[in-house]
Amino acid sequence: PKLKLSVRKGASADIPLRIETGTLSFVAISAMTNSAPLRVTATGHNIPDGWYAAIVDAQGMTELNAADSNEILDIEFHRVTWIDANTVDFDGISAAGFQSYTSGGYLAFYAPMSLASYTSASMDVKTRVGGDVILALNTTDGTLEIDAATSTVWIRLEDDSLDAVPARDYVFDIELVHATAVDAICSAESVLTVLPEVTTSV
């Protein structure tokens, strides 16, 4: 996929990249609450914290149902918070004014990709595809981190990490390394926008 990220000069940043497979998984819903945020019960959902999920075919509370259960749009996926093994909250979604849930429905989400076999990662930032590397991030110096437990690659920047990088748009790619191969997790045309530093008086 082609990613779009933004960071600001002079500011630290911790950016999570959730790495998913192309497999769409479904878990049966047994309850949805008229609350803010919306809380959904789906026994044994296995959805990591901060993942994105959609709702399909729920009865009663139909407001968040995907228009087509077999062609779910990107905008129909919402970030969820892991509450426990059977429950998630839909971040920023108030269901207080929704119709009451009656039955049925599924949580739909792309299954997390296993990162257990990967030993390192690197990210090269360039002015153009095939150009010189302006900024190199990697797991060796701690600017990248592989969190296999949550299928997440973290970008970790200190407030001085971008001192030598002018504010503008760049392209980047990220590669994961294991014993026998190197796998790209995003398009080489992914965009990193470096924003100018905002200074304040002390």
Residue ranges, per PLM feature:
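Contiguous segments within soluble domain cores/interaction surfaces
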Residues: 1-25, 111-202
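Small/polar beta-strand repeat architecture
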Residues: 26-117, 123
